[in-house]
Design a protein with these regions (language model features):
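Domain-level signal for soluble alpha/beta catalytic cores
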Residues: 1-922
Length: 922
């Protein structure tokens, strides 16, 4: 009987295949090959849609699988990376997506079975790509709440794809090139549903791609935050692919190997793309690097991504032969939560304070702001809580006059674009389950659901618990059942024990993901039966810690002092005393105001005695004495207030950040780098008196800030959400300056120039292009965005009809380089000489110098990052600067061509010498 993948991986290192796209390019396929007879009349360009070859040239795909199997691959990956409706919509082939997935799996299954033996079984991994859209980021910098793709749509598309892959014979599901963990969650969710429907145990293989030198995903998460996000799921393996070669990828693989409780996979590119978009690593140079992974015990699965072929895989198989595989880490013994960063709830954390102020039921100010749709100011409340030390931010939108689902989605989407807030996990708080699920579908990190209970019985309770697990969250469990809210110690522990058994035994929830709320209730209310509420909570906390292993305890602390509304000092002092005692007994979460000013150790001894008598219910007259104390303090505060007013005391101003002490130019630059728009209006008004023209402010301090952003992003010290935030700040600055700029202009034009943006034909990636478009628009350029997969003919036509001043070409994949040359050729043929700016992951200055500039009479300039575009565009729009720039580029390109020729000559001489070497053993 054939061994399963789960069995084989325990004994040896598994060999995965290499790149599919690289291999397909070697066949020199043309448009007709992709179309076949079936798609001969479909509009648009089909070349580059590799997945459709499963239907039109299955012989090519089977041949590629065969080559990898012959090279020693244990797992071959289906040619279905983009076989989802979302991805195929770019080609108008949505209705063929399922068939592509089905046939892709069948082709791979047929090839694998032909080579599979009892000694060396071969497996098929169904490839599931991330699509070219993201659930976690806005496509519109001016509207951070917007999303181009929602979780529910993506889930349904993935469900269709994965069902087809399993039907076609896939042994496992490989969710690869993950750049947004929320997209990955949808794929995991769909895989688990297919497993339930089919009764199959489907290994879930997760492969992430990091986008910068800091090791973050494109959506901003660190690798340990990603691990936390998926920690509730039955992941088989986790690893990295794409972005880097083996050498650059190694530190991140080490990080995963040291933290992940899963098998580790790595399939790097054949090095980094060279100046021509190719890859310089060979099987012989890559194998030793892969050998380091293996010898250091870092990996269980090894393969190749962009630029690798069957020759690489053959070398890897030789290198891995007989070597010991990586031993996965133990499952974490502490709770993992995450936003953009990990929150590991270790004993050292002691207490997780959950910020309570983003709650429409608990903050009148927050409610007012949400009702007014003043999200910008509402966000500052969340930001202040994090700055004050909140480790989690609670969000509640339950108000009768609000559309709670829509407001929850909107606010969570907005704070996801604020890195200084999004770094911490969120607590999605609602009494309505549809609001909870709406929130869960917006969050890429591992959040907390607040809450579920047995109020409606076990069936509803278990259904809600399964939803929590489906979305990979932790959960607050209220001590509330069919009989009502638990108010005594006995009822609290009865409900907690029952709920714990149901969650761990019936739905298999990890106890570490369970947070009990034994109900913090108001004390000192004047009703004797309420006096022991705090004591019973603390006793229940101790019992839960001793009897329900792994579980945590939380509570809404402000409920305790409800009777003393209006006297903040007494309320905060009560909370401090309560938390001091509850934390000692095991309370490790609490919904609190992180800006509280009263600490337990700062309370005067005489006050502390009264407060502890109340909280611990030590004396019958404690409540009366606390009321007297509250009155005394209130009178003292009023006297101080009246005295200050009579003496004309100046209002205490809010502390300003250090950078606010700099001159206005420096403040503007720093505000951009930090993405802080709060002071923009006042700073620009001051700058208008210091600079001759409004546009000088853009070209001076604002562009200085954007340059710094570009440099920080380039060296991995900023990540994409931060860059987008700075772009949004820039846009606000430009909007403030716009009336002044228009007033300065003599001819009434309202733009700095018109730029035509396009991702070239054959490439469906648009994130980089979108960022450039935003940055250009922020710098007062009119942007005509043609989208993705744009043929050269359309670019030329639009350049003429739109009277563009320049063209921006974007491309992420290697074939895009050839297409950029084609665009320049078509521009030249049409008699156009508009400046062309090119950018994207595979582009380079050397490629421009060697391939594009020589065939185009206009200026062609390579742009390293988004922040450089407006700087270059400014030079192109100034006739004198443009001529000077053209001369600089001509000289630079001539020098690069000479360097390249000299390098090639040196290589040629080396090859000649090797071929003429003396054969001593002939």
């Amino acid at each position: 009987m054939k061994q399963t993948l789960r069995e084989v991986i325990k004994d040896r290192i598994i060999i995965l295949d290499g790149a599919m796209g690289t291999m397909i390019q070697q066949y020199g396929l043309e448009e007709d090959d992709f179309r076949g007879y079936r798609y001969r009349n479909v509009e648009g360009m089909m070349k580059g849609n590799n997945d459709m070859l499963n239907l039109t040239r299955p012989d090519v795909i089977e041949d590629i699988h065969t080559k990898y199997l012959m090279a020693g691959a244990d797992i071959i990956t289906t040619n279905t990376f983009s076989s989802q409706r979302i991805s195929q919509a770019d080609y108008g082939l949505e209705t063929s997506a399922r068939e592509m997935a089905l046939e892709g799996a069948r082709i791979a299954r047929k090839a694998a079975d032909r080579y599979s033996t009892e000694e060396k079984p071969r497996f098929v991994a169904g490839s599931v790509g991330p699509t070219n859209k993201t659930c976690s980021m806005s496509p519109d910098v001016s509207n951070p709440a917007a999303r181009e793709l929602d979780y529910a749509t993506l889930y349904e598309d993935y469900l269709e794809q994965i069902e087809a892959l399993v039907e076609g014979g896939a042994d496992a599901v490989l969710i690869e090139t993950v750049f947004d963990t929320l997209n990955a969650k949808a794929a995991i969710d769909a895989t688990m549903e297919v497993g339930r429907r089919t009764g199959r145990d489907l290994p879930i293989m997760l492969s992430i791609t990091v986008s910068d030198l800091a090791g973050r995903t494109l959506s901003g998460q660190t690798l340990d935050a990603v691990l936390a996000s998926v920690s509730s799921y039955p992941i088989f393996s986790v690893g990295l692919n794409c972005s880097f070669g083996a050498d650059q990828m190694k530190p991140f693989i080490k990080e995963l190997a040291h933290h992940a409780p899963y098998y580790i996979s790595a399939y790097p590119n054949a090095g980094l793309p060279n100046s021509l978009g190719g890859y310089d690593e060979t099987p012989e140079t890559m194998a030793p690097q892969i050998g380091e992974y293996i010898d250091e015990g870092l990996v269980n699965i090894i393969g190749g991504c962009c630029g690798t072929t069957e020759k690489f895989i053959a070398k890897y198989a030789e290198t891995a032969e007989g070597k010991t595989p990586h031993r996965p880490q133990e499952k974490p013994r502490t709770m993992w939560l995450s936003g953009l960063e990990l929150l590991d709830v270790t004993p050292d954390v002691r207490f997780v304070n959950v910020g309570e102020r983003c709650n429409v039921a608990g903050s009148r100010k927050f409610l007012r702001l949400i009702k007014e749709k003043n999200y910008e100011e509402a966000v500052t409340i969340a930001r202040k809580q994090v700055a004050d030390g909140a480790l989690v931010v609670d969000v509640n939108m339950d108000d009768g006059l609000l559309d709670a689902r829509e407001e929850m989605r909107t606010f969570l989407n907005i704070i996801a674009s604020e890195p200084d807030i999004a770094k911490v996990p969120v607590m999605i708080d609602s009494s309505k389950w549809d609001v909870i699920t709406a929130g869960l579908e917006c969050v890429q990190g591992k959040c907390i659901v607040n809450s579920i209970s047995l109020k409606e019985g076990e069936e509803v309770f278990l259904s809600h618990a399964r939803d929590v697990m489906r979305y990979g969250a932790a959960v607050v469990v209220m001590c509330f059942d069919e009989k009502g809210q638990a108010t005594t110690y006995e009822r609290r522990i009865e409900i907690a024990g029952r709920a714990y058994r149901l969650l761990t035994e019936k739905v298999g929830m990890n106890p570490l993901d369970i947070i009990f709320d034994p109900n913090v209730l108001a004390i000192a209310t004047g009703m004797e039966e309420h006096d022991n509420y705090a004591v019973d909570f603390i006793r229940a906390t101790e019992w839960i810690k001793q009897n329900l292993p792994g579980a945590h305890i939380s509570g809404g602390v402000s409920n305790l002092s409800f009777s003393f509304r209006g006297n903040n000092y007494i309320r905060e002092a009560m909370h401090a005393v309560f938390l001091y005692h509850a934390i000692q007994k095991g309370m490790d979460f609490g919904i609190v105001n992180p800006a509280t000013k009263v600490a337990y150790g700062d309370i005067p001894a005489d006050q502390l005695e009264i407060l502890e008598d109340v909280v611990l219910n030590r004396k019958a007259d404690a409540a009366e004495r606390l009321i007297e104390l509250a009155d005394q303090i209130k009178q003292q505060q009023e006297a101080l207030k009246n005295g200050a007013a009579a003496g004309g005391a100046a209002a205490v101003s809010k502390a300003q950040p250090e950078w606010r002490k700099e001159d206005v130019a420096k403040r503007l630059s720093t505000a951009l780098v930090k993405g802080v728009a709060e002071y923009m209006e006042e700073d620009i008004q001051e700058a208008l008196t210091a600079f001759p023209k409004a546009v000088d402010i853009i070209e001076g301090p604002l562009m200085d800030g954007m340059n710094t952003v570009g440099e920080l992003f380039g060296c991995g010290k900023m990540f994409l959400p931060q860059v987008v935030k700075t772009a949004r700040t820039m846009k606000k600055a430009v909007a403030i300056l716009q009336p002044y700029i228009e007033a300065d202009k003599k001819e009434g034009t309202t733009t700095a120039g018109k730029v035509l943006m396009a991702t070239v034909k054959g490439d469906v990636h648009d994130i980089g292009k979108n960022i450039v478009s935003v940055v250009m628009a922020c710098n007062n350029y009119e942007v005509i965005d043609l989208g993705v997969m744009v043929p050269a003919e359309q670019i030329v036509k639009k350049a003429v009809t739109e009277k563009a001043d320049m063209i921006g070409l974007s491309g992420l994949i290697t074939p895009s380089l050839e297409e950029m040359v084609n665009v320049a050729t078509e521009m030249e043929r049409a008699g156009l000489s508009l400046p062309i700016m090119v950018g994207g992951a595979t582009t380079s200055e050397m490629h421009v110098a060697l391939k594009i500039a020589p065939i185009y009479s206009g200026i062609v300039v390579w742009v390293k990052d988004a922040a450089q575009n407006p700087i270059i565009a400014q030079r192109l729009m100034n006739p004198e600067e443009k001529a000077r720039f053209a001369k600089e580029l001509d000289e630079k390109y001539a020098r690069l061509r000479e360097e390249y020729a000299a390098h090639q000559k040196k290589l040629s001489s080396l090859e000649t010498a090797r071929s003429n070497r003396l054969d001593l053993f002939g």
